[in-house]
A protein has these predicted regions:
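Catalytic metal- and UDP-sugar-binding loop of GT-A-like glycosyltransferases, i.e.
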Residues: 5, 52-53
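Canonical Radical SAM [4Fe-4S] cluster-binding loop centered on the CxxxCxxC motif
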Residues: 1-34
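Radical SAM/AdoMet-radical enzyme domain recognition
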Residues: 37-51, 61-183
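Conserved, mostly hydrophobic/aromatic
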Residues: 11, 15, 52, 83
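Alpha-helix N-cap and loop-to-helix initiation/capping positions
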Residues: 27-32, 60, 122-130, 190-197
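A C-terminal junction/extension of Radical SAM enzymes
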Residues: 182-202
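Short acidic/His/Gly/Ser-rich catalytic and metal-binding motifs that mark active-site loops
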Residues: 13-17, 117-119, 184-186
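Active-site neighborhood of divalent metal-dependent phosphoester/pyrophosphate hydrolases
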Residues: 55-57
């Protein structure tokens, strides 16, 4: 069994297609209490993976994840921690995150797609060049390139094959997801179109 958590809805990016939902309608700064995770793990000690989504998980700071790792180590629980992050905070300040990223329990994944909808905090586009820099930072400090998720929307549907070719060039796996009607994304990507893309990839 896996546990999927969302510690925060905060994010350093402003992606136009974001389907991340709110933790609460009352407080956008709300954070998931670690003790709730600890109670779950005590009840289900054989949990395989703790999958961390966002917002962006790195908005929590390293201490949050080190406390979780210390709890797992103390109780000899087998769970690994899978972080899916845009990697920008790590690329800017890698030393800050090395204790988390280099921990053997932790695996890193990221996200990227073409089309201009992936925007940094200053609303400038997160480009392929930016993506390579973030991926290179993980390769340099952790010894591997992270796989990534790409989201299909109307604006970038013509770049799906290009995205798969990028993953091949990087030597990683790319998971091509369709946009869902959630969060800032007000309409799902049409089912018939996404199946056509999957056939084209195949």
């Amino acid at each position: 069994m896996d546990l999927i958590i969302k510690p925060t809805e905060a994010c350093n990016f402003k992606c136009t297609f974001c389907s991340s939902s709110k933790i609460t309608d009352v407080d956008s700064t709300a954070q998931l209490d670690l003790f709730k995770i600890f109670r779950f793990l005590d009840r289900y000690p054989n949990t395989n993976t703790i999958i961390v989504n966002g917002g962006d998980p790195l908005m929590m700071g390293p201490k949050y994840y080190m406390s979780l790792i210390e709890f797992l180590d103390k109780n000899d629980y087998p769970a690994t921690v899978a972080l899916t992050t845009n990697l920008w905070p790590f690329m800017v300040k890698p030393k800050k995150w090395l204790p988390v990223f280099q921990n053997p329990r932790v695996g890193i994944a990221t996200s990227f797609q073409y089309g201009g909808g992936r925007l940094k905090g200053d609303l400038s586009e997160f480009t392929e060049e930016d993506f390579w820099k973030c991926s290179d930072a993980v390769l340099k400090h952790c010894g591997y390139r992270p796989g990534f998720i790409a989201v299909i929307v109307e604006e970038n549907e013509h770049t799906v094959i290009k995205t798969v070719e990028l993953a091949k060039k990087m030597g990683v796996v790319c998971k091509v997801n369709y946009a869902m009607a959630s969060g800032e994304q007000d309409a799902p990507y049409v089912k018939g179109k996404r199946y056509k893309h999957y056939v084209d990839i195949w």
